[in-house]
C-alpha cells in the first residue's frame, strides 16, 4: 500500500469517527442501530469505530442497555473552552444570593474520576465557621450530599469502579456498607436530590441537587450546608424547593 493510499484511509477513518461523535448532538444515549442510521455507515464499520473511540475515552457504553454515550474525554476537552461555558461565573451569583438569604454555606462542585471537587463555596453561617471542604478540595465519595449525588448520576460501570475504593467514615453516621450505599445511590437518582445528615460532621446537614444540561447530563452539583435543625424538619429538607429553583435558574443561564 502506498503512502498516499494510507493517508487517504487515515483521513477517511478520522472523518467517520467525527461523524459518529457528531451523531450524539442533542442525544444522551444511542443504540448501535441509531448510530449507524445517523452516520450512514455500515454496522460493522460503526461498531469498530465505536470500540476505538471507547478505548480513547471519547465514547462510553452502558453495560445494562448496551447503548452508547459521549465519554469523559469529550467533557475534558469541553472544559477547556472557558469562554463558552464559565460554569463558576454563572452559578456563583445565584449561590451567593442563596447563602445570604438563608445564612448557610453554599457549594458548587463537579465530578472528576470518582472524586467530587469543590469549585467554590460561599459562607454565610452567622457566627459559625465551616472548614471541612476547601475550594479545590475533595470529600470521600460516601460522605456528604454532593459526592453521593454526583456519583448517583454516573453510569453503572463507573459506580462499580468507584465502589472498589475504600469507604471513609468521617462520623459514626457515614454509610460503610456497599449494599446499603448502592441502595442509597439508587434512591438519590430516582428522587433527584440528597439530604446527608451528620455524615461529614455531627450536627451539620447538607442538601444537594444536580444542575443538568439540555441532554439531561449532570454539569455540576449545587449544595448547601447548615445546622441540622436549620436544614431538616420532620425528616424532610427544609430548603429543597429553594435549592431546586436555584438549579433551574443556573440551567436556564447555561442554555443561553
How should each PLM-predicted stretch be described?
Residues 151, 158-163, 169, 247-256:
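Cysteine/selenocysteine-centered motifs that mediate thiol-based redox chemistry or coordinate metal-sulfur cofactors
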Residues 1-89, 96, 248-256:
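N-terminal helix-turn-helix
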Residues 26, 124, 213:
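Short, conserved catalytic or interaction motifs in soluble domains
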Residues 65-165:
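Amphipathic alpha-helical effector-binding/dimerization core
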